[in-house]
From Swiss-Prot:
Its main location: secreted. Residues 422-435 have a biased composition (Basic and acidic residues). The gene is tir. Residues 255-362 are extracellular. A motif (Essential for actin pedestal formation) lies at residues 452-454. The chain crosses the membrane at residues 234-254, 363-383. This is Translocated intimin receptor Tir.
Protein backbone atom coordinates (compact mmCIF):
# COMPACT_ATOMS: atom_id res chain seq x y z
CA UNK A 1 0.00 0.00 0.00
CA UNK A 2 1.74 3.19 -1.08
CA UNK A 3 2.30 5.92 1.43
CA UNK A 4 1.18 9.31 0.39
CA UNK A 5 -2.43 9.90 -0.62
CA UNK A 6 -4.37 10.06 2.61
CA UNK A 7 -7.39 11.19 0.65
CA UNK A 8 -8.30 7.52 0.24
CA UNK A 9 -9.42 7.40 3.88
CA UNK A 10 -13.15 6.81 3.58
CA UNK A 11 -13.79 7.72 7.23
CA UNK A 12 -12.55 11.32 6.86
CA UNK A 13 -14.78 12.22 3.91
CA UNK A 14 -11.70 13.01 1.83
CA UNK A 15 -10.88 16.01 4.01
CA UNK A 16 -7.39 14.84 4.94
CA UNK A 17 -4.85 16.50 2.66
CA UNK A 18 -2.35 14.32 0.78
CA UNK A 19 0.77 13.57 2.78
CA UNK A 20 4.17 13.65 1.08
CA UNK A 21 5.74 10.26 0.37
CA UNK A 22 8.74 8.93 2.21
CA UNK A 23 11.95 8.47 0.20
CA UNK A 24 11.32 4.73 -0.12
CA UNK A 25 7.96 5.34 -1.88
CA UNK A 26 6.77 1.99 -0.53
CA UNK A 27 4.75 0.76 2.39
CA UNK A 28 7.06 -0.91 4.86
CA UNK A 29 4.47 -1.29 7.57
CA UNK A 30 3.15 -4.54 6.18
CA UNK A 31 6.46 -6.34 6.69
CA UNK A 32 6.76 -7.70 10.14
CA UNK A 33 4.80 -4.98 11.92
CA UNK A 34 1.28 -5.22 10.59
CA UNK A 35 0.28 -7.95 13.02
CA UNK A 36 1.09 -6.00 16.14
CA UNK A 37 -1.31 -3.57 17.74
CA UNK A 38 0.05 -0.11 18.48
CA UNK A 39 -0.68 0.80 22.07
CA UNK A 40 -1.13 4.27 23.53
CA UNK A 41 -1.02 4.77 27.27
CA UNK A 42 -1.58 8.52 27.24
CA UNK A 43 -4.61 10.33 28.51
CA UNK A 44 -7.73 10.62 26.45
CA UNK A 45 -7.10 14.30 25.72
CA UNK A 46 -3.69 13.49 24.25
CA UNK A 47 -5.18 11.02 21.76
CA UNK A 48 -7.90 13.14 20.24
CA UNK A 49 -6.12 13.30 16.90
CA UNK A 50 -5.86 9.55 16.47
CA UNK A 51 -8.41 7.46 14.65
CA UNK A 52 -8.38 3.83 13.49
CA UNK A 53 -8.53 3.48 9.72
CA UNK A 54 -11.35 1.42 8.32
CA UNK A 55 -10.67 -0.86 5.35
CA UNK A 56 -6.95 -0.77 6.12
CA UNK A 57 -4.31 -3.23 7.17
CA UNK A 58 -5.34 -2.85 10.79
CA UNK A 59 -8.79 -4.31 10.07
CA UNK A 60 -7.28 -7.53 8.81
CA UNK A 61 -5.27 -7.85 11.98
CA UNK A 62 -7.59 -6.72 14.73
CA UNK A 63 -11.02 -5.15 14.35
CA UNK A 64 -11.04 -3.71 17.84
CA UNK A 65 -10.99 0.03 18.38
CA UNK A 66 -8.59 1.42 20.91
CA UNK A 67 -10.66 2.82 23.78
CA UNK A 68 -11.04 6.56 23.77
CA UNK A 69 -10.31 7.16 20.07
CA UNK A 70 -13.07 8.69 17.93
CA UNK A 71 -14.34 6.62 15.02
CA UNK A 72 -15.22 9.67 12.91
CA UNK A 73 -12.55 12.28 13.60
CA UNK A 74 -14.14 15.52 12.49
CA UNK A 75 -11.16 17.46 13.82
CA UNK A 76 -8.74 15.87 11.42
CA UNK A 77 -9.53 18.47 8.73
CA UNK A 78 -8.41 21.39 10.90
CA UNK A 79 -5.61 19.77 12.89
CA UNK A 80 -2.01 20.89 12.57
CA UNK A 81 -0.03 17.64 12.56
CA UNK A 82 -0.03 14.69 10.24
CA UNK A 83 2.03 11.55 9.81
CA UNK A 84 1.23 8.28 8.11
CA UNK A 85 2.01 5.12 10.07
CA UNK A 86 0.50 2.42 7.93
CA UNK A 87 -0.17 0.09 10.84
CA UNK A 88 -3.70 1.43 11.06
CA UNK A 89 -3.45 5.01 12.33
CA UNK A 90 -3.07 8.49 10.91
CA UNK A 91 -1.85 11.66 12.57
CA UNK A 92 -1.86 15.05 10.86
CA UNK A 93 1.56 16.50 10.11
CA UNK A 94 2.72 19.89 11.33
CA UNK A 95 1.52 22.84 9.28
CA UNK A 96 2.23 26.42 10.19
CA UNK A 97 1.45 29.84 8.71
CA UNK A 98 4.23 29.46 6.15
CA UNK A 99 2.55 26.34 4.74
CA UNK A 100 -0.75 28.20 4.65
CA UNK A 101 0.87 31.15 2.89
CA UNK A 102 2.41 28.80 0.36
CA UNK A 103 -0.98 27.27 -0.36
CA UNK A 104 -2.69 30.66 -0.68
CA UNK A 105 -0.32 32.54 -2.99
CA UNK A 106 1.16 29.68 -4.96
CA UNK A 107 4.27 27.58 -4.74
CA UNK A 108 6.64 29.86 -6.64
CA UNK A 109 8.20 33.26 -6.01
CA UNK A 110 6.43 36.07 -4.22
CA UNK A 111 7.13 39.64 -3.17
CA UNK A 112 6.22 41.85 -0.23
CA UNK A 113 4.63 45.24 -0.84
CA UNK A 114 3.25 47.84 1.54
CA UNK A 115 -0.42 48.62 1.05
CA UNK A 116 -2.13 52.01 1.22
CA UNK A 117 -3.35 51.34 4.76
CA UNK A 118 0.19 50.67 6.01
CA UNK A 119 -0.11 46.90 6.11
CA UNK A 120 2.16 44.54 4.23
CA UNK A 121 0.95 41.92 1.79
CA UNK A 122 2.65 38.92 0.22
CA UNK A 123 1.85 38.94 -3.50
CA UNK A 124 2.29 35.83 -5.62
CA UNK A 125 0.80 34.15 -8.66
CA UNK A 126 -1.42 31.11 -8.39
CA UNK A 127 -2.96 29.46 -11.45
CA UNK A 128 -2.10 32.50 -13.56
CA UNK A 129 -3.86 34.93 -11.20
CA UNK A 130 -2.08 37.38 -8.91
CA UNK A 131 -3.02 36.70 -5.30
CA UNK A 132 -2.18 38.84 -2.26
CA UNK A 133 -2.32 37.86 1.42
CA UNK A 134 -2.02 40.35 4.28
CA UNK A 135 0.87 39.41 6.61
CA UNK A 136 0.70 39.83 10.35
CA UNK A 137 3.55 41.40 12.28
CA UNK A 138 5.17 38.09 13.21
CA UNK A 139 5.15 36.82 9.65
CA UNK A 140 6.50 40.13 8.33
CA UNK A 141 9.31 40.19 10.90
CA UNK A 142 10.25 36.60 10.10
CA UNK A 143 10.51 37.33 6.38
CA UNK A 144 12.40 40.57 6.96
CA UNK A 145 14.86 38.73 9.21
CA UNK A 146 16.16 36.67 6.28
CA UNK A 147 15.94 39.48 3.71
CA UNK A 148 19.25 41.18 4.47
CA UNK A 149 19.30 43.11 1.19
CA UNK A 150 15.74 44.34 1.87
CA UNK A 151 14.61 43.52 -1.66
CA UNK A 152 11.30 42.03 -0.59
CA UNK A 153 11.44 39.06 -2.98
CA UNK A 154 11.36 35.46 -1.82
CA UNK A 155 11.15 31.95 -3.25
CA UNK A 156 9.38 28.92 -1.79
CA UNK A 157 11.78 25.97 -1.52
CA UNK A 158 9.58 23.45 0.24
CA UNK A 159 9.11 19.70 -0.03
CA UNK A 160 12.67 18.85 0.93
CA UNK A 161 13.32 15.15 1.01
CA UNK A 162 9.65 14.28 1.32
CA UNK A 163 9.20 16.36 4.48
CA UNK A 164 6.43 18.34 2.85
CA UNK A 165 7.30 21.59 4.64
CA UNK A 166 7.25 24.91 2.89
CA UNK A 167 10.50 26.81 3.22
CA UNK A 168 11.41 30.32 2.11
CA UNK A 169 14.72 31.85 1.07
CA UNK A 170 15.48 35.26 -0.50
CA UNK A 171 15.35 35.25 -4.27
CA UNK A 172 18.78 36.87 -4.40
CA UNK A 173 20.27 33.85 -2.62
CA UNK A 174 18.79 31.47 -5.18
CA UNK A 175 20.20 33.53 -8.06
CA UNK A 176 23.59 33.83 -6.36
CA UNK A 177 23.70 30.12 -5.58
CA UNK A 178 22.87 29.24 -9.17
CA UNK A 179 25.53 31.58 -10.51
CA UNK A 180 28.19 30.19 -8.18
CA UNK A 181 27.32 26.59 -8.96
CA UNK A 182 27.48 27.30 -12.69
CA UNK A 183 30.79 29.08 -12.21
CA UNK A 184 32.10 26.05 -10.29
CA UNK A 185 30.98 23.66 -13.01
CA UNK A 186 32.31 25.81 -15.86
CA UNK A 187 35.02 28.11 -14.42
CA UNK A 188 36.28 29.20 -17.85
CA UNK A 189 32.74 29.73 -19.12
CA UNK A 190 33.69 28.31 -22.47
CA UNK A 191 30.39 26.65 -23.22
CA UNK A 192 32.01 24.77 -26.06
CA UNK A 193 31.82 21.24 -24.79
CA UNK A 194 28.66 19.25 -24.57
CA UNK A 195 28.36 16.05 -22.65
CA UNK A 196 27.06 13.13 -24.58
CA UNK A 197 26.38 9.46 -23.98
CA UNK A 198 25.55 9.87 -20.29
CA UNK A 199 24.67 6.53 -18.73
CA UNK A 200 23.70 6.48 -15.07
CA UNK A 201 22.84 3.22 -13.38
CA UNK A 202 21.84 2.66 -9.78
CA UNK A 203 21.44 -0.76 -8.22
CA UNK A 204 20.07 -1.26 -4.71
CA UNK A 205 20.19 -4.55 -2.81
CA UNK A 206 18.37 -4.79 0.50
CA UNK A 207 16.51 -7.14 2.78
CA UNK A 208 13.26 -6.70 4.61
CA UNK A 209 14.60 -8.32 7.76
CA UNK A 210 17.27 -5.64 8.29
CA UNK A 211 20.41 -7.41 7.02
CA UNK A 212 23.30 -5.70 5.24
CA UNK A 213 22.17 -3.16 2.68
CA UNK A 214 24.44 -2.39 -0.28
CA UNK A 215 23.84 0.44 -2.69
CA UNK A 216 25.98 0.63 -5.81
CA UNK A 217 25.77 3.65 -8.09
CA UNK A 218 27.69 3.51 -11.35
CA UNK A 219 28.00 6.58 -13.54
CA UNK A 220 29.53 6.48 -16.99
CA UNK A 221 29.99 9.76 -18.79
CA UNK A 222 31.60 10.27 -22.16
CA UNK A 223 32.08 13.84 -23.31
CA UNK A 224 33.65 15.10 -26.48
CA UNK A 225 34.97 18.50 -27.48
CA UNK A 226 32.90 20.38 -29.97
CA UNK A 227 34.34 21.20 -33.37
CA UNK A 228 36.24 24.42 -33.84
CA UNK A 229 33.58 25.39 -36.34
CA UNK A 230 31.08 25.84 -33.52
CA UNK A 231 33.25 28.47 -31.84
CA UNK A 232 32.09 32.02 -32.69
CA UNK A 233 35.63 33.35 -32.33
CA UNK A 234 36.76 31.14 -35.19
CA UNK A 235 34.12 32.56 -37.52
CA UNK A 236 34.95 36.10 -36.44
CA UNK A 237 38.55 35.45 -37.47
CA UNK A 238 37.44 34.01 -40.81
CA UNK A 239 35.25 37.07 -41.36
CA UNK A 240 38.20 39.36 -40.67
CA UNK A 241 40.29 37.52 -43.25
CA UNK A 242 37.50 37.78 -45.83
CA UNK A 243 37.08 41.49 -45.12
CA UNK A 244 40.81 42.01 -45.60
CA UNK A 245 40.80 40.23 -48.94
CA UNK A 246 37.82 42.28 -50.08
CA UNK A 247 39.63 45.44 -49.02
CA UNK A 248 42.67 44.48 -51.07
CA UNK A 249 40.54 43.91 -54.15
CA UNK A 250 38.64 47.16 -53.69
CA UNK A 251 41.86 49.11 -53.25
CA UNK A 252 43.36 47.67 -56.42
CA UNK A 253 40.26 48.44 -58.47
CA UNK A 254 40.13 51.98 -57.11
CA UNK A 255 43.75 52.63 -57.98
CA UNK A 256 43.26 51.30 -61.50
CA UNK A 257 40.13 53.28 -62.34
CA UNK A 258 39.71 56.28 -60.11
CA UNK A 259 43.25 57.59 -59.68
CA UNK A 260 45.15 60.08 -61.91
CA UNK A 261 46.67 58.20 -64.85
CA UNK A 262 50.39 57.81 -65.08
CA UNK A 263 51.90 60.67 -67.22
CA UNK A 264 53.77 60.04 -70.45
CA UNK A 265 57.42 60.96 -70.81
CA UNK A 266 57.81 64.69 -71.60
CA UNK A 267 58.53 65.65 -75.24
CA UNK A 268 61.74 67.72 -75.46
CA UNK A 269 63.39 69.67 -78.34
CA UNK A 270 67.10 70.33 -78.78
CA UNK A 271 67.52 74.12 -78.61
CA UNK A 272 70.59 74.13 -80.86
CA UNK A 273 68.87 72.16 -83.54
CA UNK A 274 65.85 74.41 -83.30
CA UNK A 275 68.02 77.51 -83.56
CA UNK A 276 69.98 76.17 -86.55
CA UNK A 277 66.81 75.16 -88.35
CA UNK A 278 65.18 78.50 -87.71
CA UNK A 279 68.27 80.38 -88.79
CA UNK A 280 68.57 78.45 -92.08
CA UNK A 281 64.90 78.83 -92.85
CA UNK A 282 64.98 82.54 -92.20
CA UNK A 283 68.08 83.04 -94.31
CA UNK A 284 66.63 81.16 -97.26
CA UNK A 285 63.37 83.04 -97.07
CA UNK A 286 65.01 86.44 -96.90
CA UNK A 287 67.40 85.59 -99.71
CA UNK A 288 64.55 84.63 -102.01
CA UNK A 289 62.72 87.81 -101.24
CA UNK A 290 65.88 89.87 -101.82
CA UNK A 291 66.42 88.41 -105.29
CA UNK A 292 62.96 89.50 -106.33
CA UNK A 293 64.08 93.09 -106.13
CA UNK A 294 66.76 93.84 -108.75
CA UNK A 295 67.99 96.72 -106.73
CA UNK A 296 69.28 94.32 -104.13
CA UNK A 297 71.59 92.70 -106.69
CA UNK A 298 74.94 93.82 -107.84
CA UNK A 299 75.09 95.38 -111.42
CA UNK A 300 77.71 94.67 -114.03
CA UNK A 301 78.24 96.85 -117.17
CA UNK A 302 78.81 95.14 -120.46
CA UNK A 303 80.95 96.31 -123.39
CA UNK A 304 78.20 98.38 -124.80
CA UNK A 305 77.67 100.10 -121.44
CA UNK A 306 74.40 98.50 -120.43
CA UNK A 307 73.67 97.60 -116.76
CA UNK A 308 73.18 93.87 -116.30
CA UNK A 309 72.20 92.18 -112.88
CA UNK A 310 75.06 90.03 -111.78
CA UNK A 311 72.97 87.55 -109.75
CA UNK A 312 74.63 88.38 -106.48
CA UNK A 313 73.14 90.26 -103.62
CA UNK A 314 74.66 93.33 -102.39
CA UNK A 315 76.88 93.09 -99.38
CA UNK A 316 74.65 95.22 -97.20
CA UNK A 317 71.63 93.12 -98.14
CA UNK A 318 73.48 89.93 -97.32
CA UNK A 319 74.50 91.40 -93.98
CA UNK A 320 70.89 92.26 -93.11
CA UNK A 321 69.74 88.79 -94.10
CA UNK A 322 72.39 87.21 -91.93
CA UNK A 323 71.46 89.37 -88.97
CA UNK A 324 67.78 88.53 -89.25
CA UNK A 325 68.57 84.82 -89.58
CA UNK A 326 70.58 84.86 -86.37
CA UNK A 327 67.77 86.62 -84.55
CA UNK A 328 65.32 83.98 -85.75
CA UNK A 329 67.64 81.18 -84.63
CA UNK A 330 68.03 82.72 -81.18
CA UNK A 331 64.27 83.06 -80.84
CA UNK A 332 63.82 79.43 -81.82
CA UNK A 333 66.40 78.40 -79.24
CA UNK A 334 64.58 80.25 -76.45
CA UNK A 335 61.23 78.82 -77.49
CA UNK A 336 62.60 75.29 -77.46
CA UNK A 337 64.01 75.77 -73.97
CA UNK A 338 60.71 77.12 -72.64
CA UNK A 339 58.73 74.34 -74.31
CA UNK A 340 60.95 71.71 -72.75
CA UNK A 341 60.54 73.30 -69.33
CA UNK A 342 56.75 73.38 -69.57
CA UNK A 343 56.56 69.76 -70.68
CA UNK A 344 58.73 68.68 -67.77
CA UNK A 345 56.62 70.69 -65.36
CA UNK A 346 53.41 69.08 -66.58
CA UNK A 347 54.97 65.66 -66.23
CA UNK A 348 56.23 66.34 -62.73
CA UNK A 349 52.86 67.70 -61.58
CA UNK A 350 50.87 64.75 -62.87
CA UNK A 351 53.38 62.26 -61.50
CA UNK A 352 53.36 63.89 -58.07
CA UNK A 353 49.56 63.87 -57.94
CA UNK A 354 49.45 60.20 -58.85
CA UNK A 355 52.04 59.28 -56.25
CA UNK A 356 50.11 61.12 -53.57
CA UNK A 357 46.91 59.31 -54.44
CA UNK A 358 48.70 55.97 -54.49
CA UNK A 359 50.24 56.54 -51.09
CA UNK A 360 46.91 57.58 -49.58
CA UNK A 361 44.94 54.67 -51.01
CA UNK A 362 47.67 52.18 -50.19
CA UNK A 363 48.00 53.43 -46.63
CA UNK A 364 44.31 53.15 -45.95
CA UNK A 365 43.25 50.26 -48.14
CA UNK A 366 46.25 47.96 -48.19
CA UNK A 367 47.32 48.58 -44.59
CA UNK A 368 43.86 48.08 -43.12
CA UNK A 369 43.18 45.06 -45.30
CA UNK A 370 46.53 43.53 -44.44
CA UNK A 371 45.90 44.12 -40.74
CA UNK A 372 42.53 42.39 -40.98
CA UNK A 373 44.07 39.43 -42.78
CA UNK A 374 46.92 39.10 -40.29
CA UNK A 375 44.62 39.53 -37.27
CA UNK A 376 42.09 37.06 -38.61
CA UNK A 377 44.81 34.54 -39.34
CA UNK A 378 46.25 34.86 -35.85
CA UNK A 379 42.80 34.57 -34.27
CA UNK A 380 41.90 31.50 -36.29
CA UNK A 381 45.23 29.89 -35.47
CA UNK A 382 44.96 30.58 -31.75
CA UNK A 383 41.36 29.35 -31.61
CA UNK A 384 42.28 26.15 -33.42
CA UNK A 385 45.28 25.61 -31.15
CA UNK A 386 43.16 26.09 -28.02
CA UNK A 387 40.58 23.62 -29.25
CA UNK A 388 43.25 21.07 -30.01
CA UNK A 389 44.84 21.57 -26.61
CA UNK A 390 41.57 21.28 -24.70
CA UNK A 391 40.24 18.38 -26.73
CA UNK A 392 42.20 15.53 -25.03
CA UNK A 393 41.13 16.67 -21.55
CA UNK A 394 37.46 16.75 -22.51
CA UNK A 395 37.39 13.49 -24.41
CA UNK A 396 37.48 11.37 -21.27
CA UNK A 397 35.32 8.52 -20.13
CA UNK A 398 34.91 8.37 -16.38
CA UNK A 399 33.34 5.55 -14.40
CA UNK A 400 32.47 6.40 -10.82
CA UNK A 401 31.19 3.76 -8.42
CA UNK A 402 29.62 4.61 -5.08
CA UNK A 403 29.20 1.73 -2.64
CA UNK A 404 27.49 2.11 0.70
CA UNK A 405 27.14 -0.72 3.20
CA UNK A 406 24.86 -0.15 6.16
CA UNK A 407 24.22 -2.52 9.06
CA UNK A 408 20.63 -2.66 10.27
CA UNK A 409 19.63 -4.87 13.15
CA UNK A 410 16.24 -6.42 12.99
CA UNK A 411 13.78 -6.08 15.80
CA UNK A 412 10.20 -6.83 16.73
CA UNK A 413 9.12 -3.32 17.57
CA UNK A 414 5.47 -2.36 17.36
CA UNK A 415 6.26 -0.08 14.43
CA UNK A 416 8.63 -2.41 12.63
CA UNK A 417 6.85 -1.70 9.37
CA UNK A 418 8.64 1.64 8.97
CA UNK A 419 12.16 0.15 9.12
CA UNK A 420 12.51 -0.07 5.36
CA UNK A 421 11.61 3.58 4.98
CA UNK A 422 14.18 4.62 7.60
CA UNK A 423 16.79 2.37 5.99
CA UNK A 424 16.17 4.01 2.61
CA UNK A 425 16.45 7.44 4.17
CA UNK A 426 19.69 6.65 6.03
CA UNK A 427 21.08 4.97 2.93
CA UNK A 428 20.54 8.15 0.97
CA UNK A 429 22.44 10.06 3.67
CA UNK A 430 25.37 7.65 3.57
CA UNK A 431 25.36 7.76 -0.20
CA UNK A 432 25.83 11.49 0.16
CA UNK A 433 28.94 10.88 2.27
CA UNK A 434 30.41 8.49 -0.28
CA UNK A 435 29.70 10.93 -3.08
CA UNK A 436 31.54 13.58 -1.07
CA UNK A 437 34.71 11.51 -0.98
CA UNK A 438 34.40 10.55 -4.63
CA UNK A 439 33.89 14.15 -5.70
CA UNK A 440 37.11 15.16 -3.92
CA UNK A 441 38.99 12.56 -5.96
CA UNK A 442 37.52 13.52 -9.33
CA UNK A 443 37.36 17.27 -8.78
CA UNK A 444 38.62 18.08 -12.29
CA UNK A 445 36.25 15.72 -14.08
CA UNK A 446 33.77 17.56 -16.26
CA UNK A 447 31.20 14.81 -15.63
CA UNK A 448 31.06 15.21 -11.84
CA UNK A 449 27.46 15.34 -10.65
CA UNK A 450 26.15 18.18 -8.53
CA UNK A 451 24.23 17.10 -5.46
CA UNK A 452 20.99 19.02 -5.13
CA UNK A 453 21.44 21.30 -2.10
CA UNK A 454 17.80 20.59 -1.21
CA UNK A 455 17.97 16.82 -1.67
CA UNK A 456 18.89 15.17 1.64
CA UNK A 457 17.75 16.95 4.79
CA UNK A 458 16.57 14.16 7.00
CA UNK A 459 19.63 14.13 9.27
CA UNK A 460 19.48 15.76 12.69
CA UNK A 461 21.30 18.96 13.53
CA UNK A 462 23.76 17.14 15.82
CA UNK A 463 24.76 14.32 13.48
CA UNK A 464 28.10 12.56 13.28
CA UNK A 465 31.19 14.65 12.37
CA UNK A 466 31.56 12.72 9.13
CA UNK A 467 28.38 14.37 7.84
CA UNK A 468 29.33 17.92 8.76
CA UNK A 469 31.59 18.57 5.77
CA UNK A 470 30.04 19.87 2.60
CA UNK A 471 30.39 18.24 -0.81
CA UNK A 472 33.48 19.25 -2.72
CA UNK A 473 31.43 20.87 -5.43
CA UNK A 474 30.36 23.46 -2.84
CA UNK A 475 33.80 24.09 -1.29
CA UNK A 476 34.23 27.44 -2.98
CA UNK A 477 30.55 28.31 -2.84
CA UNK A 478 30.32 27.56 0.88
CA UNK A 479 33.00 30.15 1.57
CA UNK A 480 30.28 32.75 1.33
CA UNK A 481 28.47 32.83 4.69
CA UNK A 482 25.28 33.99 3.02
CA UNK A 483 25.15 30.93 0.82
CA UNK A 484 26.78 28.25 2.92
CA UNK A 485 23.81 28.20 5.24
CA UNK A 486 21.61 26.94 2.42
CA UNK A 487 23.48 23.65 2.34
CA UNK A 488 24.77 23.30 5.88
CA UNK A 489 22.11 22.06 8.29
CA UNK A 490 24.47 19.88 10.32
CA UNK A 491 26.99 20.55 13.05
CA UNK A 492 26.84 22.73 16.12
CA UNK A 493 27.17 26.10 14.39
CA UNK A 494 24.14 28.34 14.60
CA UNK A 495 22.37 28.99 11.32
CA UNK A 496 22.44 32.67 10.43
CA UNK A 497 18.86 32.78 9.17
CA UNK A 498 19.21 32.97 5.42
CA UNK A 499 16.82 30.06 4.91
CA UNK A 500 13.45 29.94 6.63
CA UNK A 501 11.88 26.58 7.38
CA UNK A 502 12.45 23.36 9.30
CA UNK A 503 13.93 20.70 7.01
CA UNK A 504 14.07 18.09 9.76
CA UNK A 505 10.41 18.40 10.66
CA UNK A 506 7.37 16.69 9.33
CA UNK A 507 6.78 13.14 8.32
CA UNK A 508 10.41 11.99 8.30
CA UNK A 509 11.51 12.82 11.84
CA UNK A 510 8.22 11.81 13.45
CA UNK A 511 8.12 8.59 11.47
CA UNK A 512 11.64 7.83 12.64
CA UNK A 513 10.58 8.29 16.27
CA UNK A 514 7.62 5.96 15.78
CA UNK A 515 9.56 3.22 14.05
CA UNK A 516 12.68 3.32 16.25
CA UNK A 517 10.82 3.35 19.54
CA UNK A 518 9.69 -0.05 20.79
CA UNK A 519 6.79 1.58 22.60
CA UNK A 520 5.42 3.11 19.44
CA UNK A 521 3.46 6.18 20.42
CA UNK A 522 4.38 5.91 24.06
CA UNK A 523 7.58 7.99 24.32
CA UNK A 524 8.77 11.21 22.78
CA UNK A 525 5.43 12.04 21.19
CA UNK A 526 4.36 14.92 23.35
CA UNK A 527 3.85 17.03 20.25
CA UNK A 528 1.30 14.66 18.68
CA UNK A 529 -1.46 15.76 21.02
CA UNK A 530 -4.53 17.87 20.90
CA UNK A 531 -2.67 20.65 22.69
CA UNK A 532 -0.44 23.12 20.87
CA UNK A 533 2.85 21.16 21.09
CA UNK A 534 4.61 19.45 18.21
CA UNK A 535 6.93 16.48 18.26
CA UNK A 536 8.87 17.79 15.33
CA UNK A 537 9.55 21.04 17.12
CA UNK A 538 10.79 19.01 20.10
CA UNK A 539 13.01 16.78 17.98
CA UNK A 540 14.56 19.44 15.79
CA UNK A 541 14.51 23.10 16.69
CA UNK A 542 13.80 25.59 13.94
CA UNK A 543 17.06 26.88 12.45
CA UNK A 544 15.83 30.40 11.83
CA UNK A 545 14.88 33.33 14.05
CA UNK A 546 11.39 34.61 14.34
CA UNK A 547 8.17 33.19 15.76
CA UNK A 548 8.15 29.48 16.37
CA UNK A 549 4.93 28.96 14.48
CA UNK A 550 6.13 30.66 11.28
CA UNK A 551 8.54 27.97 10.10
Amino acid sequence: MPIGNLGNNVNSNNLIPPAPPLPSQTDGASRGGAGQLINSTGALGSRLLFSPLRNSIADSVDSRDIPGLPVHPSRLATATSEICLLGGFEVLHDKGPLDTLNKQIGASAFRIEQQSDGSYAAIGEKNGVEVSVILNSQELQSLQAIDIEDKGRFVFTGGRGGGGHSMVTPASDIAEARAKILAKLDPNNHGGSQARNVDTRSVGVGSASGMDDSVVSETRTSSTASSVRSDPKFWVSIGAIAAGLAGLAATGITQALALTPEPDDPTTTDPEQAASAAESATRDQLTQEAFKNPENQKVSIDEIGNSIPSGELKDDVVAKIEEQAKEAGEAARQQAVESNAQAQQRYDTQYARRQEELELSSGIGYSLSSALIVGGGIGAGVTTALHRRNQPAEQTTTTTTHTVVQQQTGGNTPAQGGTDAIRAEDTSLNRRDSQRSTASTHWSDTSSAVVNPYAEVGEARNSSPARQAEEHIYDEVAADPNYSVIQNFSGNNQVTGRLMGTPGQGIQSTYAILTNNSAGLRLGMGGLTGSGGSAVNTANAAPTPGPGRFV
